[in-house]
Amino acid sequence: MEISDDVTNPEQLWKMKPKGNLEDDSYSTKDSGETSMLKRPGLSHLQHAVHVDAFDCPSELQHTQEFFPNWRLPVKVAAIISSLTFLYTLLREIIYPLVTSREQYFYKIPILVINKVLPMVAITLLALVYLPGELAAVVQLRNGTKYKKFPPWLDRWMLARKQFGLLSFFFAVLHAVYSLSYPMRRSYRYKLLNWAYKQVQQNKEDAWVEHDVWRMEIYVSLGIVGLAILALLAVTSIPSVSDSLTWREFHYIQSKLGIVSLLLGTVHALVFAWNKWVDVSQFVWYMPPTFMIAVFLPTLVLICKIALCLPCLRKKILKIRCGWEDVSKINRTEMASRL
């Protein structure tokens, strides 16, 4: 069956997506004899009672089915980013003090080092969710039409955006859990006693630092709101939930609220850094701290998003996505392909 070329609206394609129940469909078919009886909901258990394993998946299909095909690229990217960030943080937090001052901080690896890796991976994966959409808009502007296929690598990337987003939410939740575990660490309690002893030695009655208090209150609040929006995005990506939404509702949540969560995560990292941007001691072996590297890609994505929202570009993108074609660019592309 061929789909007509007139069906190009995403909302129409959303309505065409099958949402029915398999049992209701099988019950409504006009089969005769025992087959129709077994397909009724009340007697469906009789059909599954005999040779369940043989009917569920034939032996020849067990060898041809792929194992998590849509998750391969996102998991590989997440593993690479996690490994590189871990080695980078290990070099800064553990190896550097060991080499320069013979101080051993290996106890930081299970919690502190890992908790610097998690936010870096989470915000980078979230940026990778929205970067291909902006690249696709640039490609459409360059081609002057929406009917020309995207490059294979971009097409594969766009199909994996859901998995990138779910992995980002997973790492963000781990980051929140690890952060909440800070006061439970024995090393933190020892450090707290040392800070109190130093305060007594310095004869300080109040150790309140106004700007540090504001810094922590703001970035914790931003982190909570950003994680809540990420949770909403993760819930709406569940098929049963997305099927209950209209195209406009689903598109609004995934696109608009997704960018808001990326913005909140970026500001969360910037406020966490506070005045460390100009602190020379933060640069170990001329290497910047991880939060400086973490905000680079999200900031680039947000800048590109703002640029594409300019009226001169936004109107043209909307016209192209509605079916308009730039004849001059199409003819130029055809002439270049012939040459």
Curated annotation (Swiss-Prot):
GO terms for cellular component: endosome; endosome membrane; plasma membrane. Residues 1-11 have a biased composition (Polar residues). It holds the Pfam family Ferric_reduct. Residues 1-34 are annotated as: Disordered. The modification Phosphoserine is found at S28. Heme b binds at H175, H268. GO terms for molecular function: heme binding; metal ion binding. It is a multi-pass membrane protein. The keyword Cell membrane applies. FAD binds at Q140, R161, S237, Q254. Keywords: Cell membrane, Endosome, FAD, Flavoprotein, Heme, Iron, Membrane, Metal-binding, Phosphoprotein, Transmembrane, Transmembrane helix. It is found in: Endosome membrane; Cell membrane. Residues 118-265 form the Ferric oxidoreductase domain. The chain crosses the membrane at residues 79-99, 109-129, 164-184, 218-238, 258-278, 283-303. It comes from the Eukaryota. Its cofactor is FAD; heme b. Does not function as a metalloreductase due to the absence of binding sites for the electron-donating substrate NADPH. Homotrimer. Belongs to the STEAP family. This is STEAP1 protein. It comes from Mus musculus (Mouse). The lineage of its organism: Eukaryota, Metazoa, Chordata, Craniata, Vertebrata.
